[in-house]
Amino acid sequence: MTDVLPTTPTASGVTDRPLSEVDPEIAAVLDAELGRQRDTLEMIASENFAPRSVLEAQGSVLTNKYAEGYPGKRYYGGCEHVDVAEELARTRAKELFGAEHANVQPHSGASANAAAMHAFIRGGDGILGLELAHGGHLTHGMKINFSGRMYDVSSYGVDPQTFRVDMDVVRAVALESRPKLIIAGWSAYPRQLDFAAFRSIADEVGAHLMVDMAHFAGLVAAGLHPSPVPHAHVVTSTVHKTLAGPRSGLILTRQEFAKKIDSAVFPGQQGGPLMHVVAAKAVAFKVAGSEEFAERQRRTLEGAKIVAERLTAPDVAEAGVSVLTGGTDVHLVLVDLRDSKLDGQQAEDRLHEVGITVNRNAVPFDPRPPMVTSGLRIGTPALATRGFGAAEFTEVADVIALALKPEFDADALRARVAKLTAEFPLYPSAGSFA
């Protein structure tokens, strides 16, 4: 029989009852998910573990507050405390990335991209971005996405031999299509982009340059990846992934474009900001300015290079497995399975069987459908956050390599994964979040 909630608002009513009492089904979901995260190795490149401090801010009483507008210019009363939170988030973001202006209200990276486009171009204008099948993002011009429906899309791809972006090709496409906005950024590309070259091309064709640094923002914050801020007219990002903050968005720009960006976010794209998430962003930006965070990013890069090196070894190559571009400059490795007996779905399932979570991913010129694919995207941020160093990444890289070979011992590999999860407990003092 379903529990009946109290009908009168008393001190002992629903506002004071824990989740485990009010909704045991959802409490069970939280406990089960915490168990999954603790007992497996998370290697999806876009995922990370937010610090407990971020989780506390996001699950706070700021959830209750509406705050349409911006600090000091709200359309609601009672915003004096959330104004402080948003100012801290804006100031910390600007300092972290060396930007003149920051908007911390976007609900997601996609929202940030939509607002940035809305600020600089109009419906029907041309945009130029990395082709989705070659590592671009949905919001960079996919036909069924808002970006593909609203704008005239041209795309650049990667070289069929090197699988790298060729700036001469980008320039040629830009000169032919004359876009109003050029997008540099990616969702699945293992190398750094030349932001100065992108800006030069944008200037040549009279376009604005937008850089989507959602995946590598944490590396930029730590000084381990070139910053797009000096080159781009506008920079967008998520605050999770390598930044390990709440799932949300961020826009950085110059002071001359501040009003345009702010108006595009509110009221152009959104209503009230999620102030509990804004506060969590402020915490994440503070953490990202620490030496501990920089050290974690160094281990993230080191881990990705270790994984890439192991997956280029002769025994793995014999199984038809290769690494796109031969390595990585960032936090992820793209695995090409076109010559393997495994497709992307099968490889993902195999790693899941031994306790490693990755995602299947299309590779450039992929002959298989998107729900199957011929590749894997493997990332190291979450394991670096968990505390992994060179020795642990060497071990997990070997587990991955053995799991992708035709014959593998699932029980033995699962035991090796279990040993790693036990040695590096996740949220050890949390008990249950439910």
From Swiss-Prot:
Subcellular location: Cytoplasm
Signal peptide residue numbers: none
Subunit structure: Homodimer.
Sequence similarity: Belongs to the SHMT family.
HAMAP family the record matches: SHMT
Gene: glyA
EC number(s) recorded for this UniProt protein: 2.1.2.1
Annotated pathway: One-carbon metabolism; tetrahydrofolate interconversion; Amino-acid biosynthesis; glycine biosynthesis; glycine from L-serine: step 1/1
Cofactor: pyridoxal 5'-phosphate
Pfam family, one: SHMT
Catalyzed reactions: (6R)-5,10-methylene-5,6,7,8-tetrahydrofolate + glycine + H2O = (6S)-5,6,7,8-tetrahydrofolate + L-serine
Binding site for (6S)-5,6,7,8-tetrahydrofolate: 132, 136-138
Record protein name field: Serine hydroxymethyltransferase
Site (Plays an important role in substrate specificity): 240
Superkingdom, taxonomy of origin: Bacteria
CDD domains: SHMT
Alphabetized GO MF terms: glycine hydroxymethyltransferase activity; pyridoxal phosphate binding
UniProt KW Transcription regulation keyword: no
InterPro entries for the chain: PyrdxlP-dep_Trfase, PyrdxlP-dep_Trfase_major, PyrdxlP-dep_Trfase_small, Ser_HO-MeTrfase, Ser_HO-MeTrfase-like, Ser_HO-MeTrfase_PLP_BS, SHMT-like_dom
GO BP annotation list: glycine biosynthetic process from serine; tetrahydrofolate interconversion
Disulphide bond pairs: none
Species per Swiss-Prot/TrEMBL record: Kineococcus radiotolerans (strain ATCC BAA-149 / DSM 14245 / SRS30216)
Annotated PANTHER family: SERINE HYDROXYMETHYLTRANSFERASE, SERINE HYDROXYMETHYLTRANSFERASE 1
